[in-house]
Amino acid sequence: MREIIQGLLFVALGSVFGGMARFWLSGMVARRIGETFPWGTLTVNVSGAFAIGVFGALAASGHGVFSTPGPWLFAVTGFLGCYTTVSSFALQTLALARDGESLRAISNVTFSLVFCLIAVALGFAAARVLA
């Protein structure tokens, strides 16, 4: 029971920081670039994909910070789980499509998929080089 409560606390704490980081970064990007395209959400999701690539590579190595469950629960389940957002991506894409912005909607799907996959691969590679 103690491990479950401890795990919940790691996830909760990571979620608080992940949510605040998402709010700040997404808003900052939207204010600087504009809101005609969901650049803030795309930035958050791509940077989150890079981070999970790094964390995944560290976990796959079998040693280091992710050799115990606490850091993974905090960083991946909590922080990145709250930081990245598929639901906002889906809502913004639907809004673009419903507003007759089909090209922007398709671009959002394409950019998100391609850039997030590239970011995960780059994060994984960066962690391997640094390890």
From Swiss-Prot:
Q: Which GO molecular function annotation, any one, does this entry have?
A: fluoride channel activity
Q: Which compartment or compartments is the protein found in?
A: Cell inner membrane
Catalyses which reaction(s) = fluoride(in) = fluoride(out)
* Encoding gene, per UniProt annotation: fluC2
Question: What family is this protein classified in?
Answer: Belongs to the fluoride channel Fluc/FEX (TC 1.A.43) family.
> What InterPro entries does the record tag this protein with?
FluC (IPR003691)
Record field: transmembrane: 4-24, 46-66, 71-91, 105-125
For this record, the Gene Ontology CC terms, alphabetical, are: plasma membrane
The UniProt function text for this chain reads: Fluoride-specific ion channel. Important for reducing fluoride concentration in the cell, thus reducing its toxicity.
Q: What switches its activity on or off, per the activity regulation note?
A: Na(+) is not transported, but it plays an essential structural role and its presence is essential for fluoride channel function.
Keyword Plastid listed? The answer is no
Q: Which Pfam families match?
A: CRCB (PF02537)
The record describes its membrane topology as: Multi-pass membrane protein
Q: Which UniProt keywords apply?
A: Cell inner membrane, Cell membrane, Ion channel, Ion transport, Membrane, Metal-binding, Sodium, Transmembrane, Transmembrane helix, Transport
Q: Does the keyword Magnesium apply?
A: no
Give an example GO biological process: cellular detoxification of fluoride
The name this protein carries in UniProt is Fluoride-specific ion channel FluC 2
Per UniProt, Na(+) binds at: G81, T84
